[in-house]
Amino acid sequence: MKVAIAICRNIWYSEALSEMNTQILVSILGLAILAALSSGAKAAEPELAVEVSELLKAMEHAPQPQERECRWFWGACKSDSDCCRYLGCKRKWPNICLWSPWG
């Protein structure tokens, strides 16, 4: 163990390698900081998902899929009236709602 420490000390203090060693040390410390920050963010991620889902459930006027009066972009349709404003029903197969200059 003492030999390994002595070798590391000799490499670290050599003048030719001191600048490179500093850069390597800074890089390793930077990666360690990024790893710590990302692990903290991953730990908080499930809490955020729960909070967002609770907020959506608490909204009284949350949009529900069955309340839609029109079909959105790429939705299946039979006529232009099925599609939302500025969308028109494509005349050929597949019949889907697309952007329409006349809609």
From Swiss-Prot:
Disulfide bonds join C70-C84, C77-C89, C83-C97. Expressed by the venom gland. It comes from the Eukaryota. InterPro entries: Huwentoxin-1. GO terms for cellular component: extracellular region. Keywords: Disulfide bond, Ion channel impairing toxin, Knottin, Secreted, Signal, Toxin. It is found in: Secreted. Residues 44-68 form a propeptide. Residues 1-43 form the signal peptide. One of its GO terms (molecular function) is ion channel inhibitor activity. The keyword Disulfide bond applies. Belongs to the neurotoxin 10 (Hwtx-1) family. 45 (Jztx-60) subfamily. The presence of a 'disulfide through disulfide knot' structurally defines this protein as a knottin. Probable ion channel inhibitor. This is U28-theraphotoxin-Cg1a.
